[in-house]
Amino acid sequence: MDAAGGLLSLGAYGSGVLGAWERQARAISNEGQIRRTRETDGVFMFGDSIGVQDGPALARQLTQLGISIAVHNWAGRPVTPAVDALDLWAQQYGLPHRILMSVGSNDIFTPPAVEAQVDRTMRIVGEERIVYWVNVQAARTGHGPDIKVSDQRNSAWINLQLADAQRRYDNLRIVHWAEHLASSPNRLARLLRDGLHPSVPLGQNARNGLIIEAIKAG
């Protein structure tokens, strides 16, 4: 969520305004890997800066389980353009049985946008595929207390939309990262390096572990 670095104002929801993200770091699989993943019914992943950071380690773990992965991870990106990328891959390559959505942290600036994009994701994917969506935790330590409170409130708002969507879609699985962090007093400090991005290796291993557990559970 590096696009959050320059806050021009508190924005409409108190967390600031999302900056330009299009020139930020990205990790996108080549066409050969995308097609192999589709043909072997692996996992398509769409993420933000957390995906850019943690995606390679997740890919190694999935490979050890015999599961291929193709990624479209882009730092600073909110949900809407991530779903655009999902739609494009669906049209160009078709989709495997499992889709991992690791986005939402950059939507603390405009939380109401998430619900429609979750619905859009589920329409693109259809009823026969499973979507794994990692929920969010943000309270950026580099900002003042008012912004951190807004971050936390907006994260909860996003997560509520995901929970509501799960009740509407039988094939939507929520990966409960926020609950994992909240379940022990020291986890926020140990598993997040800046109130948002997982620490390496502890936070990265914990978050990727939750994703692996969800995928293995089906």
Where are these regions (language model features)?
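N-terminal secretory targeting modules
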Residues: 1-45, 51, 92, 187, ...
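Conserved SGNH/GDSL esterase-like catalytic core that processes O-acyl groups on lipids
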Residues: 31-120, 140-146, 156
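Active-site loop/turn elements of alpha/beta-hydrolase fold enzymes
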Residues: 74, 136, 177-179
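Surface-exposed alpha-helical segments enriched in charged/polar residues
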Residues: 91, 119-123, 160-167
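Alpha/beta-hydrolase-fold catalytic nucleophile elbow
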Residues: 102, 134-135
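A short helix->loop->beta-strand "cap" motif at the edges of active sites that frequently abuts
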Residues: 126-130
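Catalytic His-Asp segment of secreted/periplasmic serine-dependent ester chemistry enzymes
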Residues: 141-218
